[in-house]
Amino acid sequence: MTTSSDSAMVNHTPSPWYKFGFKSFAEFNTYVTFVFLGMSIMMVASAVTSAPDFLTRYYVYATGDPDAVAETPLFWNNANTFYNAGTYVLQVLTELFSLTPFMRRIPLSVRLFVGLGIPFAELLLIIIVPAATIKSQHGAIAVIMVVACVGGFSKALCDSCTNALVGPFPTKFMNGAQWGLTVIALLMSIIQIILKVSMGTSFHDILTMSRIYFGICIGIQLFAIFELAILRFNPFAQKYIAEYRAGAQRNAQNNESTLEETAPSMNEPAAGDIADLPATVDDKERALNEEEGDEVRAVTSEEFHVKRGAVLTATGDADKMVDLDQTGNITSTEQLLRASAASVFKRVYPMLVCVFLIYFTSLLTFPGVFFLVSTTSGWYMTVIVTLFNAGDFISRMVLMFRPLRPSPKVVVAGTLGRLIIIPFLVLCVRGIIRGEALPYVLITLLGLTNGYFGCMACIHCPRTTTLRYAGERSLAAMLSGISIMLGLCFGSNLSLAITLTH
């Protein structure tokens, strides 16, 4: 393969408005798959966080004693914060390990299926323990922390692999995966409110609600696995996921060999043979059917000498570029192994810093510090969680419209500007500003800015014209996931320290 430029323009024919920008069912189903993969990343965490009363009183249901008194009030009063801290610590470690050559050699689909399978064990454990009951409250604490740590591992696998898969796709697919993160959170909050309103508050009612609640989670997780399983056969997804494309071409070549043996007169071009392709096939389609030459695929040393923070000054549209390593016979593993994480980091680090700071601020204050506000309302915690999830959801929906997407420089400004929420929250916690109205306003703003600037910072990482290889885009997306986890980890642990010393 030879190429004279780093990118090629792809012809985009506008589709009717009622198709919402999708040109085929295969493209739409690919988008749906990434939404559900995003949902699966936060499935267990969102389910637990959206039912704060169930978690903080889990010792009652685990021991089967409706009159049980907390033996370790320090833990149970801050169960949500302890859960988040345990989850994010292990998730950060696993995500960092995912950058090593050893992990990159494991096929993405294998890692992703493992990550999607683990939540079943977590959800079943949460449900089964109250059904079987245990004698010790310390056992209930152990269950929560085991679920937190195992959940951190599974989330890391799902997050890193989903980011690696979606990185080379056009921007709207990255937005779909990011949107899925908050769709599940809002959905769990709505389900929790419906169940809380429609059912009683007795011991057995709460147990029934929890089984319905977590059963719905299991159903959604099953659908996500189904969507991932059929994604391998999706022709649109094969254009961008080298692992699936290589497998499809191997199958095509095997089928062609069989046909040649039974019908020698047939002379169909083999997969990867571009000699007979019609001239009307666009540049991207042609690149996908070319054979890869090692001398072309290796990233040249000149490409490592890039401007630091180039993402802030990049021009052009990454969606109109053809990545140089999107050829017919390369796999996703090879793309990842040939890209340099250091080179990618150098180009997109301003957005990575924004991602870290946004999620650090969010987890520093939510849910722990917001729950420290003095209130007599039994709905306060549920409303706080719902407002954050709703704001996060709405702002990510806004980003589906290209004109409303902020530039990298605006993302930097927004990241710094949202810090003004913190001093007002401190006034509420200290009782200087009383009531629930201001905390509700602040949590809504926190959710809106978390989704708008956080999601856009993650999108700018892989979808920048400073990256020219699919492997680089996958690594950039993985780095954004690591930045999220670092922000969540440090934010949740600092929040834990604040709540414990309050």
Curated annotation (Swiss-Prot):
UniProt xrefs under Pfam families: Nucleoside_tran
Could you tell me what induces this protein? Pufine starvation does not affect expression.
Outcome after substituting S160C:
No significant effects on inosine uptake
Q: What is this protein called?
A: Nucleoside transporter 2
> Per the record, GO CC terms?
plasma membrane
Kindly list the GO molecular function terms attached to this UniProt entry.
nucleoside transmembrane transporter activity
Q: What is the effect of changing G139C?
A: No significant effects on inosine uptake
What is this protein for, i.e. what is its function? High affinity transporter for inosine and guanosine.
State the organism of origin: Crithidia fasciculata
Q: What is the effect of changing A164C?
A: No significant effects on inosine uptake
Region annotated Disordered, chain positions: 252-273
Protein family: Belongs to the SLC29A/ENT transporter (TC 2.A.57) family.
- Indicate the impact reported for K155Y: Abolishes inosine uptake. Retains significant cell surface expression. Does not affect resistance to tubercidin. Confers resistance to formycin B
The effect of T171C is: No significant effects on inosine uptake
* Catalytic reactions of this protein: inosine(in) = inosine(out); guanosine(in) = guanosine(out)
